[in-house]
Structures are given as C-alpha cells and as structure tokens.
Amino acid sequence: MGIEGVLDKGFVTTSLDSLINWGRTGSMWPMTFGLACCAVEMMQTGASRYDLDRFGIVFRPSPRQSDVMIVAGTLCNKMAPALRKVYDQMAEPRWVISMGSCANGGGYYHYSYSVVRGCDRIVPVDIYVPGCPPTAEALLYGIIQLQNKIKRTNTIAR
C-alpha cells in the first residue's frame, strides 16, 4: 500500500485509491466457471497445498457474491450465452481470468464448428493463463498478476 507519510501522533496518510485497491486485492472472491479439464487444476489451486485462502481468495458459487470469474476449459457455442449472463450478474468492479488454451483461443478444438475461439469474444478478459492444462502454479501466478493490475488502477475519477 502506498503510504505517503507517517505523522508524529501515529497517523498514517495515504491516497484513497491505494487504500481501496489494497482492500480489493486482499479480498478477491472468484467464481468458478469450470468447463473441462482445467477445472481440476483450478480445484487443486484452492486445496491445501497452494491454499488460496492465505491471499484472502475464497471461491464463491454465486456470481452476485464474486468479483472475479475464472473461465477454465473449452467454451462451446451453446455455453456462450450462459457465460455472458453469469458475467452480467456479477457486481462492478469485475475481472475475468481465462485459464487454459481452450479458453484462451479454442485450443485443441480450435477448428471445431461448435467451439468459441477464445472466451474474450464473449466477455472482456483481464488475465490469460496459458497451458493445456495450466498448472496450479500458473493459475496462482495469474491471480497474483491480476492483483498487481488491480493495484495499478485508478478507482476514483479525477
């Protein structure tokens, strides 16, 4: 957090932007949107070995309780409207992590008639995590990159 100054009486001064962004990075609640084998790696990231709870990250089942969506796996044309509907139900500010080659660009099924060639055609994506399937460490790195991106944003319009 960008502490601007510490005064004699024990007060700390900082900007409101850095305080709000610090709170947002410390309490990200992702919603799982597991569509294929990448979801298994996403579950492993939330388990005891990597323990996302230490970062304040708690998986939520409802889009109304989440601010991060992790799209993991192959997105088919039939599932695309459901993805958009769930994204629209999330409260602002909201972020999207695209996990795996299939979610990033269609992956192995890129030339199939029924596969969306990247979930960024349906929802805006903030972080892309490559791999087929990406490891739990790669997803953890993507989450940390999203936290860094949130820290750099301006919250209050000037």
From Swiss-Prot:
Its EC number is 7.1.1.-. The keyword NAD applies. GO terms for molecular function: 4 iron, 4 sulfur cluster binding; iron ion binding; NADH dehydrogenase (ubiquinone) activity; NADH:ubiquinone reductase (non-electrogenic) activity; quinone binding. It is an enzyme of class 7 (translocase). It is found in: Cell inner membrane. Gene3D superfamilies: 3.40.50.12280. InterPro entries: NADH_UbQ_OxRdtase-like_20kDa, NADH_UQ_OxRdtase_20Kd_su. One of its GO terms (cellular component) is respiratory chain complex I. Its main location: membrane. [4Fe-4S] cluster binds at C37, C38, C102, C132. Belongs to the complex I 20 kDa subunit family. This is NADH-quinone oxidoreductase subunit B. It comes from Nitrosomonas europaea (strain ATCC 19718 / CIP 103999 / KCTC 2705 / NBRC 14298). The lineage of its organism: Bacteria, Pseudomonadati, Pseudomonadota, Betaproteobacteria, Nitrosomonadales.
